[in-house]
């Protein structure tokens, strides 16, 4: 997706999400520095002769007409659809239209290992620099109109970026900001708070929920007791919690009430016969931050 089409992409994302809050501020309210990204302002627009992929699994609708009125798609019909007066017509013959992509596992940082040596070895701690300027643009340019940060190393930066995007002063997708990684003792990453007790886990979730985080992610070295406290506090506030886990097995996390698990079986430790309670297995928990 060309970044200059982000206003249209936002409209498609709004349609896919129903009648919730707009992804972006209306074009007329965007900061002047962002106006050059818009090739087609919002208004009454008819997209004709498009192939529509609606994301439901249904076959694509060929030669379709899409009617857009302001921030909402009002109709998706066949080629014979009547186009109301005063609609701007854009011919999309040969092009495909689909709802904005909802990214379920995204980050606003890029991993770097400044202390790596010539043989590829590195010493703790790792440093993870934030990409507050380029990451939102790159996501949007590739069609991601809604993203979940799924673990943050600089949660205030993520929350402030979300605020700038929502107010129309910065380019980027709608953001579900996950709080800081809920990591236990022994983290590789210097930017992570290391939780020391169930009460610490509860207080961490409560604090960041009050700051504006809307979901949470447990990380590799958290204990079962700490994870349970974090889950209970998140659920008390009607938020969900996921995990990139190795100290806690998947069955243990499911029993504790976790809502989601990231990365599949390559970080799952339940089948390791040498697995110790609340500890990552040998060779597991290698820092990937993916």
Where are these regions (language model features)?
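Bacterial N-terminal signal peptides that target proteins for export
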Residues: 1-7
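Bacterial N-terminal signal peptides
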Residues: 7-17
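Boundary at the C-terminal end of the N-terminal hydrophobic targeting segment
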Residues: 18-20, 27
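Histidine-rich, glycine-flanked metal-binding segment
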Residues: 30-31, 37-39, 43, 52, ...
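Metal-associated gating/positioning segment near the N- to mid-region
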Residues: 96-164, 188, 199, 251-257, ...
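Active-site gating loops and adjacent loop-to-helix segments of metal-dependent hydrolytic enzymes
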Residues: 110-128, 171, 179, 183-188, ...
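Divalent metal-dependent hydrolysis catalytic cores, especially in the metallo-beta-lactamase
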Residues: 134-155, 174-180, 210-222, 240-242, ...
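Active-site core of metal-dependent hydrolases
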Residues: 218-290
């Amino acid at each position: 997706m060309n970044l200059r089409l982000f206003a249209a992409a936002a409209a498609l994302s709004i349609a896919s999400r129903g009648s919730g809050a707009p992804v972006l501020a209306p074009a007329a309210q965007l900061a002047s520095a962002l106006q050059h990204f818009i090739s087609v302002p919002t208004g009454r627009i008819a997209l004709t002769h498009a192939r529509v992929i609606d994301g439901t699994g249904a076959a694509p609708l060929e030669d379709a007409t899409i009617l857009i009125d302001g921030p909402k798609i009002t109709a998706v019909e066949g080629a014979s659809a009547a186009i109301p007066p005063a609609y701007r017509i854009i011919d999309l013959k040969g092009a495909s239209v689909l709802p904005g992509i909802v990214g379920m596992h995204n980050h606003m940082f890029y991993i770097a290992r400044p202390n790596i040596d010539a043989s590829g070895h590195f010493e703790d701690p790792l440093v993870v620099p934030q990409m507050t300027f380029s990451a939102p643009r790159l996501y949007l340019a590739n069609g991601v109109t809604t993203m979940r940060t799924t673990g943050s190393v600089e949660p205030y930066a993520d929350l402030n970026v979300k605020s700038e995007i929502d107010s129309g002063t910065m380019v980027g997708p709608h953001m579900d900001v996950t709080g800081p990684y809920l990591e236990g003792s022994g983290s590789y990453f210097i930017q992570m708070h290391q939780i020391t007790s169930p009460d610490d886990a509860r207080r961490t979730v409560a604090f960041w929920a009050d700051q504006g985080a809307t979901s949470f992610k447990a990380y590799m070295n958290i204990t079962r007791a700490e994870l349970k406290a974090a889950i209970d506090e998140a659920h008390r506030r009607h938020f969900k919690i996921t995990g990139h886990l190795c100290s806690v097995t998947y069955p243990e996390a499911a029993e504790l009430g976790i809502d989601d698990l990231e990365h599949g079986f390559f970080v799952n430790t339940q089948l390791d016969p040498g697995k110790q309670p609340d500890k990552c297995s040998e060779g597991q928990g290698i820092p990937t931050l993916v």
